[in-house]
Amino acid sequence: MPLSQIARWIAVAALGAGPALAADNPLQPSPAWDEMRLAVIGTETEPPVDPAVLDLDAPMRADNPALVPIRITQPPGAPAITRLALVIDENPAPVAAEFTLGPATAPLDLEVRVRVNAYSDVRAIATLADGRQVMAGRFVKASGGCAAPAGRSGEDARKDIGAMRWTSEPAGDRAMGQLMIRHPNFSGLQRDQLTLLDIPAEFVRSVTLRQGDALLMEMEGGISISENPVFRLGYTPDGAPVTIHAEDTEDRQFDASFPGSGG
């Protein structure tokens, strides 16, 4: 499927997902999170949940467990975030992604699509510029997302692998950028629908997005990021070109550059 068709599909999906994202589905008690908290955030202290600093929207019940939209936002004037961990408690690899964020992304508005493998809390833990941590999250009803069949398999899945598209549209005095990367992002839990053989894990492990020399976003990801990764990010544009560098678990490297206008 060409990237242009993917873009149209995402636009339709985003419109359809809007009402669901507003559902009241707060975090639930999670023994899995209690066990992993220290390893993930470096402390046993539970970060406070404070919507005045950080919020996370996700559907109460996922239409497609392999393509669950997550949006992480801050209100105007909220303190800047330097690092962010996205955790899906009940996934085989719970840490879906870790982000490093540049000053131009404040206040944060970040969207990503993930796989959810079982009914689970989906949480974001932000580290602020002053070192404090704050958390936001939702409970999502979904199952089987990490093992859901890939859209394509075999060599067909790798056709145009690493192709990227970047678009940017004005959003008030800021801009909303969207990055799409062609990649199967195999989770290691899927099967080839023709051969019925297990497909080894093969996914985008890092993405670095810059505006000129300034960092916008760096992501270290795992198997929970959906096939053909898509990231939407609010930022303050300065007219400089946007460059992207990505690497996957097969040591492939992908690079692209786009004009500051977002073409």
Region locations from a protein language model:
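Low-complexity, Pro/Ser/Thr- and charge-rich linker/hinge segments at domain boundaries
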Residues: 25-31, 143-168, 263
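N-terminal edge beta-strand
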Residues: 38-67, 154-172
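Short edge beta-strand/loop segments characteristic of extracellular beta-sandwich folds
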Residues: 57, 69-76, 176-184, 192-197
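Extracellular Ig-like/FN3 beta-sandwich strand-entry sites
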Residues: 65, 117-121, 174, 239-241
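Beta-strand signatures of extracellular beta-sandwich domains
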Residues: 83-87, 206-210, 245
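Aromatic sugar-binding surface patches on proteins
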Residues: 102-111, 223-234
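Edge beta-strands of extracellular beta-sandwich domains
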Residues: 134-140, 252-263
